[in-house]
Amino acid sequence: MDKNLFVALTIAIGSAMPAFAIGLLASKGLEAIGRNPEAASSIQTAMILAIAFCEAIAIYALVVALIIKFV
């Protein structure tokens, strides 16, 4: 098959799933802060750390797509 198709599928799936996870994390994090405002700082810290890990997966997908494209 065409390399460009594999690149497109890699970056599409590799960025769509982390985007879904980030949306779910933010939704549940804000819901938890709404229920317990005193714990907002610890919830926010954990939420930002989890979002960073999800973004790392999207960056790995970009790197894999670039490797497929140029190698």
Task: Name the predicted role of every residue range.
Residues M1-V71:
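Hydrophobic alpha-helical transmembrane segments of small proteolipidic membrane proteins, enriched
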